[in-house]
A protein has these predicted regions:
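PLP-dependent aminotransferase-like
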Residues: 4-22, 30-107, 111, 119
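Short, conserved charged micro-motifs
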Residues: 78-81, 252-259, 300-306
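Active-site PLP attachment segment
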Residues: 127-169
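Active-site C-terminal subdomain of aminotransferase-like
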Residues: 151-201
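Conserved PLP cofactor-binding pocket of PLP-dependent enzymes
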Residues: 170, 237-244, 248-249, 253-291, ...
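Conserved glycine-rich beta-strand-loop-beta hairpin in the small C-terminal domain of fold type I
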Residues: 197-226, 235-249
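Proline-centric
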Residues: 291-303
């Protein structure tokens, strides 16, 4: 029986999601597990250059795993053919995997899965299984989209997200540092999550986002950073639509991150597991350690990008002075 009356709850927002016709799930990693169930996939070929949350989830689900390296252009170093039943998992690092490249791998291997965690605004291609993570681009507690033509025959419970909002609301009203440990605890709790339908809360919040404004702001900020760092940045990357971050390579990235944090410029490390386990000579170790994801998202304006440049160059100057 529907409740009527009493105190008011969060309003139903009147906008539209960017992806209205995809499967809505709780997390990117669980979207992958759900897809593997739908496809009957028993084995994945994963990049070494990958966060351990995906790896742990796949192992826990009993999926066999093999790994491949990437070169300095982030090109997968994979065999010419795959074993029967194996799916190639392609990560779109910083939005650099073009549609043409995806279609090349689809034609060559057939069984591919594309991870668009870094490329929310790159639309899926027909017949290509594609996964998106919502919380990497927006202030959300969870949420993922799955594009697939596989039949969703497996029933799922719906997720509940209200208890995961504390660090988001806390940073909005106060600051990031006060809620950093809460954010980590929240992320850690995802390890126990199974595939579920996206929560009503997350779906509702996704309806309240002005996506065209987000794209425009991210691209303006990216270009502003490129004016400061483009000549110094050795990475041959192109700006994707609505970029995730501005990836800036600096050969002492681990030390530089520590210095920038002291002046409240927080540059996350996305692949700590790679730094811990890869060989120091590998591309994976080099990029996980030394690519600095400079923030260019919709929270900021060009003047904020000026501040990013000022703080980063001050930290570089300080670091190079200590040589």
């Amino acid at each position: 029986m529907k409740e009527i009356g009493g105190y008011l709850e969060l309003e139903e927002l009147a906008g539209e999601e960017y992806y209205k016709d995809m499967y809505r799930l709780n997390l990117g990693r669980t979207a992958l597990l759900y897809l593997c169930r739908l496809r009957g996939c028993k084995k994945l070929l994963l990049p070494y250059f990958l966060c351990d949350s995906v790896i742990k989830s796949c192992r826990h689900a009993g999926i066999d795993l093999e790994y491949y390296h990437v070169d300095s252009n982030l090109t997968p170093q994979v065999p010419d053919s795959l074993e029967s039943g194996t799916y190639l998992y392609l990560v779109n690092y910083y939005g650099q995997l073009t549609d043409e490249t995806i279609l090349y791998y689809k034609k060559k291997y057939q069984h591919i899965i594309v991870d668009h965690t870094h490329a929310f605004f790159q639309r899926p291609l027909p017949g290509v299984d594609t996964i998106y993570s919502c919380r990497k681009f927006f202030g959300l507690p969870d949420g993922a989209y799955l594009s697939t033509d596989a039949s969703p025959v497996l029933p799922l419970h719906q997720d509940l997200s209200g208890s995961r909002m504390e660090h988001l609301l806390g940073r909005y009203e106060k600051d990031a540092a006060s809620y950093y440990s809460t954010m980590l605890d929240n992320a850690s709790s995802f390890q126990q999550e199974s595939p579920k339908l996206m929560s009503r809360l997350t779906q509702n919040l996704l309806k309240g986002i002005d996506y065209e404004r987000v794209i425009e702001r991210r691209e303006i900020n990216y270009r502003r950073l490129d004016k400061y760092f483009g000549d110094r940045n050795p990475l041959p990357f192109q700006m994707p639509r609505g970029p995730f971050t501005y990836p800036f390579y600096y050969p002492k990235g681990i030390k530089l991150r520590k210095l920038t944090a002291s002046c409240k410029l927080y540059l996350p490390t996305y692949w700590n597991n790679v730094i811990q386990h890869a060989t120091a000579e590998s591309v994976e170790y080099d990029y996980a350690s030394n690519i600095l994801p400079l923030p260019c998202d919709q929270r900021y304006n060009p003047q904020d990008m000026d501040a990013v440049a000022d703080r980063l160059y001050a930290a570089i100057k300080d670091l190079e002075r200590k040589k």
